[in-house]
From Swiss-Prot:
Family: Belongs to the universal ribosomal protein uS14 family. Zinc-binding uS14 subfamily.
Gene: rpsZ
Binding site for Zn(2+): 24, 27, 40, 43
Record-linked PANTHER family: 30S RIBOSOMAL PROTEIN S14, SMALL RIBOSOMAL SUBUNIT PROTEIN US14M
Obligatory cofactor(s): Zn(2+)
Oligomeric and partner information: Part of the 30S ribosomal subunit. Contacts proteins S3 and S10.
Cofactor note: Binds 1 zinc ion per subunit.
Any one GO molecular-function label of the UniProt entry: rRNA binding
Protein name per its UniProtKB record: Small ribosomal subunit protein uS14
Keyword RNA-binding applies: yes
Phylogenetic placement of the source organism: Bacteria, Pseudomonadati, Thermodesulfobacteriota, Desulfobacteria, Desulfobacterales
Protein source organism: Desulfatibacillum aliphaticivorans
Length: 61
């Protein structure tokens, strides 16, 4: 419940612009957010391994 309320709170426009922070829309995680994809690293990894993100491939060297 706390995570859900924090997600709703993050969607509101704050009094000052610097107070905005990014949250994953899928799981609500505030840390490990990837701006390019708009999701957290854990959701990114799951979606990439399922093939849901076009153009993303697993690297190997």
């Amino acid at each position: 419940m706390a995570r859900k309320s924090l997600c709703v709170k993050a969607q509101r426009t704050p009094k000052f612009k610097v107070r905005t922070y990014n949250r994953c829309p899928l799981c609500g995680r505030p840390r490990g957010y990837m701006r390019k994809f708009g999701i957290c690293r854990i959701c990114f990894r799951n979606m990439a391994s399922e093939g849901l993100l076009p153009g993303v491939i697993k690297s190997s060297w």
